[in-house]
Regions:
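Core segments of small alpha/beta cavity-forming domains
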Residues: 1-55
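Short, solvent-exposed beta-strand/turn "edge" segments of beta-rich domains on protein surfaces
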Residues: 2, 51, 66-68, 93
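Amphipathic alpha-helical interaction segments
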Residues: 19-20, 60, 121
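Amphipathic hydrophobic-ligand
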Residues: 54-57, 96-98
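Short amphipathic beta-strand and strand-loop transition segments with alternating hydrophobic
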Residues: 58-67
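Exposed beta-sheet edge and beta->alpha loop/turn motif
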Residues: 70-122
Length: 122
């Protein structure tokens, strides 16, 4: 379960940095192309709106929902805080969810586990 927690933490940290405009998204080893594309699209929409997001999240709890040889589903509770700011730094909005419940789906391919999808706000 610690490996799954590390993988999800890696995703959350990299996604957060990317949506804040800090660097590129570099997750192809642990996240499916579909999720990476979704995140890039979200950032491109933010750029058009001249905003960025600062996201702080912390895993509180992970429960295994189901597991097969090629798929793992976990339910995760997060402390989640998202701030939306204009490129000038001006505050726009803030969302705080404690906890935010998210279902993460991991798939096994090319000899490793990857995050393939998630559903938040359960």
């Amino acid at each position: 379960m610690e490996d799954i927690k590390n993988l999800i933490n890696g995703w959350l940290l990299n996604k957060s940095n990317y949506l804040a405009g800090k660097g590129e998204i570099n997750l192809s080893k642990i996240v499916s192309k579909g999720l990476i594309d979704r995140t890039i699209e979200e950032r491109q929409n933010d750029i058009k709106k001249e905003i960025y997001k600062e996201i702080d999240s912390q895993i509180l709890k992970i429960d295994l929902e189901s597991q097969t040889s090629s798929r793992i589903v976990v339910l995760v509770e997060l402390n989640y805080l998202e701030r939306i700011l204009k490129n000038s730094g001006e505050f726009v909005n803030e969302t705080s969810l404690n906890p935010l419940k998210v279902k993460y789906i991991l798939g096994f391919s090319n000899k490793s586990w990857k995050l393939v999808d998630f559903v938040s706000g359960l």
